[in-house]
Amino acid sequence: MAKKISIVVSVYNEELGLTQFYDHTSPILKDACANAGWDYELIFVNDGSRDASLDLLKGFAAADDHVIVVNFAANRGHEAAMIAGIDIATGDGIVCMDADLQHPPEAIPDIIAKFDEGYDVISMVRTEREDAGIFKKVTSAAFYKVMNQMSKANFENNSSDFFGISRRVALVLKKDYRERVRFLRGYVQNVGFKKTTLEFKASARVAGESNYNLKALVKLSLNAICNFSDAPLKMGIYAGMVSLAFSFILIIYSIVQFFLGNAPDGYSTLVVLISFMFGVLFIILGFISEYLAIIFAEVKNRPIYIVDSIITKNGEERNE
């Protein structure tokens, strides 16, 4: 029996570029699998889109037996959509990618080749991004540097949600990595097994705008930090030590100035110290709140996603 590759695509309000993605990706996938002797399935996960994305996906499924559409009951987020796709995928190898063509389908033959070589994890690393400004490049580089410093895990610079995993890695993710607050690319980077890296150039979006605004990126960053590091919880200890040392120096300085007859203005010093301490304390409190929110989400044990329906061959739809 031929091996199968599952392509998982998260979709949220992508109607403007969805047809272009399908028309571009489908023949590349078909040719790559024919050359490698693999079968394939193309899994679209509709993450509660409010536009015509679902109608387009139903059309793809009706015309193409390889297309499967997983329709969420409500928007659950990009990572939940990828997890759902991984859960339902039946392939020996699974590739997650976005629907905006920033993740090039042309890389699929190389990914299949790596699966044939026995790799379990194929990490896709961006070497260039056409629509990324200086701010995004700097903050992205800083994020991965901070993550590698704060945690024992290893994060490749410019890694993305474009990756390939083997069937056994998918089963590990399905069984053991079911956190309600998660950082999927971090799990993939650090799950272990035989791993390799491929590079790609991220093109500009084919249409529409990115669904990742600044708020979403900040949330993703906080999730990553809190999932892979306990360093923020230790900030209070370090901040206390620094504050104690600073206070000791200030006391010595004040005593010396007093005996020299140059007593410092106590009000200004007090305002600066209080402002500094409150700033540090609120940062620490914010991180503690994030950890508590994660614990709260885990205790509630609510589902990561809820599937409304699955559309398979010839447009057949079944409710879940």
Could you tell me what each predicted segment is?
Residues 1-27, 31, 35-38, 317:
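N-proximal low-complexity "stem/linker" segments adjacent to membrane-targeting elements
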Residues 2-4, 185-320:
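Hydrophobic helical membrane-anchoring modules
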Residues 14-17, 49, 104:
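Donor nucleotide-sugar binding loop of glycosyltransferases
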Residues 33, 40-43, 54-88:
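Conserved donor nucleotide-binding strand/loop of the catalytic core
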Residues 43-54, 101-102:
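A conserved acidic beta->alpha catalytic loop
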Residues 72, 97-99:
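Catalytic metal- and UDP-sugar-binding loop of GT-A-like glycosyltransferases, i.e.
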Residues 72-74, 78-88, 105-182, 203-222:
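Acceptor/aglycone-binding surface of glycosyltransferases and processive sugar-polymer synthases
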Residues 94:
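Short aromatic/hydrophobic "clamp" motif used to bind/position activated sugar donors
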